[in-house]
């Protein structure tokens, strides 16, 4: 008879096998039938605010970052939303409008990652901490937004997610529930669990190459991804404006503007395929 610990271990192994199979049936890291495709590496890319800064999206932690106008507690926590939902909605409405300005466009780094996905197909996964849609506009489709998406809202009661490009007003409600509920930004706030973590950790365990771009290394769990990838044998690469807080964890490092170092590295990688 299995002990309680044995039952837990058995259940964990079954869940892990089930999740691995589900991932293989999804959009990334699925083995191909064609022999040539089997030789291509599985590449997992993590992007942070640094990749979008050159497109005009202001970063959180730079000297001129958004947090200077508002306290984090006021605009990026569930408690802040409960205290003053109109302030929080106004904050994200302004960011949503900025994202849709014609001058905000994907830069060369975004385009290079779309090119890399074109070459690797479902052996490529992009995990982003950014809530903008510049990766999708550049052409990437295998994307997990672990911190949510600015152009979406969700019902504060049921969690149903809706596409949303305009401002959110106090009168806007979700009608999916018996009683219309307020909408909130589809953004992961401080103290909330990032999205897609099961898929991300499984992908980290399967990756041959892990690349971090434009990340500070301050925010967990993303800052720990390089260590997780290394544990499973992945080659690790940092492409950043300057060394991140976890830069010493990476085997290969290139520093400079994302629009310069990312295309250069992608070309180097593609030549080796």
From Swiss-Prot:
Residue ranges constituting the Deacetylase sirtuin-type domain according to the UniProt record: 20-272
Cofactor details (free text): Binds 1 zinc ion per subunit.
Principal location class: cytoplasm
Keywords, ordered alphabetically: Cytoplasm, Metal-binding, NAD, Transferase, Zinc
Active site (catalytic residues): 147 (proton acceptor)
Enzyme class label: transferase
Cofactor dependence: Zn(2+)
Domain notes: 2 residues (Tyr-92 and Arg-95) present in a large hydrophobic pocket are probably involved in substrate specificity. They are important for desuccinylation activity, but dispensable for deacetylation activity.
Protein name per Swiss-Prot or TrEMBL: NAD-dependent protein deacylase
Organism: Escherichia coli O157:H7
Taxonomic classification: Bacteria, Pseudomonadati, Pseudomonadota, Gammaproteobacteria, Enterobacterales
Primary gene name: cobB
